[in-house]
Amino acid sequence: MRVLKLISQILVFIACVYLAKQLFTLDEIKLINTKNESNESFSHDLIIKENLLTGAFNKTKEEASHLSLITSQIIDAGSDILLSIGTSNKLDMNFTQSPYGFEIIDYLESLRTIRVRVDDPVSFAQFLADNGDGFEFEQNVRLKLPAVPEQRILEAEEPFSGLSMNWLGAKSDRRESGHGIKVAILDTGIDINHESLYGLDYSEVSLLDNGIDAGIGHGTGIASIIAGQTDEFLGLAPSSEVLSVKVLNSDGEGDSFTIAKGIVLAVDQGSDIINLSLGGFSSSAAMDQAIQYAKSKDVLLVSAVGNDGTEGVLYPARHKDVIAVSSVDAKSRVSSFASYGPEVDLAAPGVGIVTAWEDNHFVEFSGTSIATAFVTGALAHELSKSPSQNKNVIIEALYSNLDETEKPGKDIWAGRGVVNLRRLEQRNTPGIVDAAVVGYYFDSNNLSSSGTIPFQVTVQNQGTAWIQSMSLKVNYKGLEKNFRLGNMSAGESRSETLYFDSDSPDKTLSISSELSLLGQTDVLPKNNVRKSSLILP
């Protein structure tokens, strides 16, 4: 029976290898200011095609023989394998020499993980069978840049262009923001000679074998949002120290061992926050250990949920100790390309963001990768105000001052809500009155039905003062509905339900909503009104 169990584990592994070949797209890059005049497009999204095979080798000699045979059949010569050594294992490092069928490539001591290349699968399998107690092994999974996402997806989104910082409510006098905070960017590398990054407090470590600096646009764009230096492209935390850890080569390819090694290096070099604008479908034991190592040192990790546009938050964003970031457009609508699931924590701007790029270019950058950079920058900004503050307190402050999206409460699309730096900055300032219409929510299960269908209009008190009394007026389909909302506490949200006839031949639904406050003056009246036009299925 135990032999059959081992065989079943191997078969599961083979299935994982097959499924991991499915690719996803995270980011769309459109060149907007370059030396050539073409409207060239780039895709710089990352995939970790991860396959995990974990074994606890407490077995008889017969079972070991079966395992050796099966393992040799699924591991080819040249395979890149990670061996995790249990703390109880006292093996001498000489075991890595011949005749055991593999060559050591690298070793991450803090995680007790060895990266090896298998030369002789049969000898390697026998080594595992003979020395398996306290060992786990997995393939060192690769990263890949898939094709450019379909442009039709982005055409339905409202781009931010150069207005993302104002939209977030970032202060113009933030040049000292980020002082005393170190941010690590694990990516393709950064073009430190870009005009928007002149003066950046910067260091770089490459974990790659070659020193080629081509293909570093993705990391450069991330860095410009976090710590851009010029007035035109001022980042959210321009005085932060940036550590660029190059874990992806010029083709945007890397592996889980190198990323895990990069996380450990960033932690050991004193980073406060690690930006991981990358992801994959399955987990990696080596990266799990690296994430736990970062947590033990009180280092924050921020990662993109992915751009697959379907349910399933990517790894490492879905790890419970990583902040998972989705994307919204300029109308605060969750991007249709963003992956979703219960692990999503929050959302930030991610459509048509103007950022730096390599060779002194500027691009429009779309994807959850760039949304992740906004969250990293916001955290660096807040941490710099109180460097000794417990980081969990800062995270809670960020979460408590997010804007609602279409559906009230935590949801699988935007998590707890959308980043609002203005609210975060002013959270301790009393007396701010700010009511907002935040959106409309349609349950997708209802849209395919006939007859009368409900939808919700959601409003939120985004100030710090109680709203004493306000009314909501909604116009749609020739109807006007009025609601008396009464009082609302700071941060509170409330929804009203309305109905429309789905059998109408006119599939366009135009909605206009307006809030009116009684006896109070709203400091930001423009968000009291929301007009939307939707095409119903």
Segments predicted by a language model, with ranges:
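C-terminal subdomain of the subtilisin-like protease fold in secreted/lumenal serine endopeptidases
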Residues: 31, 56, 61-62, 68-73, ...
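Terminal connector regions
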Residues: 504-537
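Substrate-binding/access-modulating region of protease and related hydrolase catalytic domains
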Residues: 229, 247-321, 331-334, 340, ...
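Intrinsically disordered, low-complexity Pro/Gly/Ser/Thr-rich segments with frequent PxxP/GP/PP motifs
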Residues: 479-505
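Subtilisin-like serine protease catalytic core
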Residues: 171-183, 190-203, 210-256, 319-321, ...
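Hydrolase catalytic cores
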Residues: 223-226, 247-248, 273, 336, ...
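Inhibitory N-terminal propeptides of secreted protease zymogens
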Residues: 22-149, 271-272
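Protease zymogen maturation seam
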Residues: 59-67, 71, 103-111, 129-182, ...
